[in-house]
Design a protein with these regions (language model features):
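Catalytic donor-sugar/metal-binding loop of nucleotide-sugar-dependent glycosyltransferases
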Residues: 147, 170-173, 182-200
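Short beta-strand-to-loop acidic/aromatic patch adjacent to the donor-nucleotide binding site
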Residues: 80-91
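Donor nucleotide-sugar binding loop of glycosyltransferases
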Residues: 13-16, 40, 93
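A conserved acidic beta->alpha catalytic loop
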Residues: 37-45, 90
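Short, well-formed alpha-helical segments that are part of the catalytic scaffolds
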Residues: 12-26
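Short hydrophobic beta-strand elements that form part
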Residues: 5-9, 57
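Cell-envelope/extracellular polymer assembly enzymes that use nucleotide-activated donors
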Residues: 3-5, 180
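Acceptor/aglycone-binding surface of glycosyltransferases and processive sugar-polymer synthases
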Residues: 58-77, 94-175, 202-212, 216-219, ...
């Protein structure tokens, strides 16, 4: 039987977790759920444990990338065949997990849930952010030769070889955890497929990035992509 781990990074999500975990259990009750409490100041970890999930508490906030890396380390050490990363705030519809896993069944090594794929382009995004996302998508296409409609989506599934890779290589910087990870996987020679998903409003709570200057962070990401070219080249060399 294929062992699958659901990885859920969470920062101060005590309000949204009960409904999110309940809905998740209705879809994937047979899979293990790991909630990574990313230095929360509320009762996120306790709520996760009471709901039957495995809870890992970080002593301070690492950010989504750091939390996901912890989850991938856990999956690697405990022999999971596949891992799925999903938000704790309820914006990712757990029903999308089925499509992500089916993509792996059909040969993908990694599957990305796209908010902007055909038939799902109804996710509200501000003009500046949308333009920045398109620009990043163009960079990824230039570097990998593959077109992606949503390079910053955090709703993803990984097969075992990619778990092994990203458990040691997963970026921890904000936004790099999605875009740079995608580049790392493609440069290592793995196949990445997109599947359409739908996003929903948060179940509760306040977005942790509400006050983040997205323009500055996108510029930092661009600099990071340019600065990490040697690491990706090493991965491509290792694959060859």
């Amino acid at each position: 039987m294929t062992r699958i781990l659901i990885i859920m990074p969470a920062l101060n999500e005590e309000e949204s977790l009960p409904a999110t975990l309940k809905e998740l259990r209705e879809v994937v009750d047979e899979h293990d759920i790991l909630v990574i409490d990313d230095g929360s100041t509320d009762s996120t970890a306790d709520v996760a444990s009471r709901a039957g999930a495995v809870s890992a508490q970080l002593p301070f906030t690492l950010g989504v990338g750091g939390a996901v890396r912890v989850g991938l380390h856990y999956a690697q050490r405990n022999g999971y065949d596949r891992a799925v990363v999903i938000d704790a705030d309820g914006q990712h519809d757990p029903a999308g997990i089925t499509a992500l896993l089916e993509a792996l069944d059909h040969g993908a090594d990694m599957a990305v849930g796209s908010r902007f794929a055909a038939g799902t382009d109804d996710y509200p995004v501000g003009r500046t952010r949308r333009q920045a996302m398109r620009f990043l998508g163009a960079i990824v296409r230039a570097l990998t030769g593959q077109r992606f409609s949503d390079v910053t989506s955090g709703f993803r599934a990984f097969d075992r070889p990619v778990i092994e890779l990203l458990a040691r290589e997963y970026p921890v910087e904000y936004l790099a955890d999605t875009v740079e990870a995608l580049l790392i996987v493609r440069y290592a020679g793995f196949r990445v497929d997109e599947v359409p998903i739908r996003m929903r409003p948060r179940a509760a709570g306040v977005p942790s990035t509400r006050r983040v200057n997205l323009v500055i962070n996108y510029l930092r990401l661009l600099i990071g992509i340019l600065g990490s070219a040697s690491r990706r080249a090493r991965l491509r060399k290792d694959e060859a």
